[in-house]
Structure formats: structure tokens, C-alpha cells
Amino acid sequence: MKQRRPTRNSRRAISLLGALMVMPLWAALATAPSTAAHANARRTGERTTWDSVFSAAQAGRGETTYKQLCARCHMETLAGGDEAGELTGSAFMSSWNGQSLADLHERIRSTMPTDTPGVYTAQQVTDVIAYMLRFNGFPPGSIDLTHANDALKGIRFVSFPP
């Protein structure tokens, strides 16, 4: 009996089936760090970026500030460019997952803009963070995010909703 070789379409179908079988596992692994970050925040009494920690008005101010001070390098879409990293998307979200907003605030405040770091006020940075959070799909609340370091330390950046 002559053995038939798999056709190109059958190989594609097998590859697609394999990918579909692996996707749920990949999704579970991708959300595991966020699940742990949520659990840790709840255990320590901290809030997360999903707890409506900024106001819509503050995000609006942050958008204006971002467009004036940041968009030249980070682009209006927050996608980054040749000169600056992205401020949205999976790489950005996973790199900040589990860290405090105080860490993010300090990073921006001490390194931006790259040619004259530290010139932005704490309020400008906080407003821009509120805009970044809104842009990345986090829900606004009714109270502005404070720039007080102790309060920012108590808010964890968590990539995925609980």
C-alpha cells in the first residue's frame, strides 16, 4: 500500500489546531502574574490600577500635558519611536506589572525628558500617568491621583483586571 504524504493544507490545519490548543495555556500563563499582583495587593491592603485611582478630568489634563511635552518622542499614540519606548501595549504593561505607581512616577520624574531630566513638576507627571492609565484601559474614578509618594507606593500597577 502506498503511503500518502500530507498535503500543504493538511499541514496547515494541523498547525492551526496545535496553536488553538496552546492558546488557552498561553493566556493562563500571561495572566498569572497579574492574578498574583491582585492577590498580593489585596493581602497588603493596597489598591491597584483597576480601583479607579484617577479622575477623568485629571486624565484630560494629562493628555494635554502629554501632547505638549511627551508626544514628540513617544508619539501621540504612546507607541514610542526611535528615540523613546512605548507607553502602551503588552511590553509596557508587563514591564510595570506588580510595581507601584510611585516607581513609575519616579522613573518619569527622574529620567524625562532625556535631555533635561527632572524639569517636570510632580503634578505634571501625575497627570500624565493618569492619561497613560486611561489610554491603557484603566477605569477613571471621581478623585484625582495624588502625587504624594506614600500614597503612590500604595497603588500597584496591575496589567489585567481582577
Predicted regions span which residues?
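Gly/Gly-Pro-rich "capping" loops immediately C-terminal to redox-active cysteine motifs
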Residues: V53-A59, T77-P113
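The canonical Cys-X-X-Cys-His
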Residues: G62, Y66-T77, V128, M132
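Cleavable N-terminal signal peptides
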Residues: A30, S34-A37
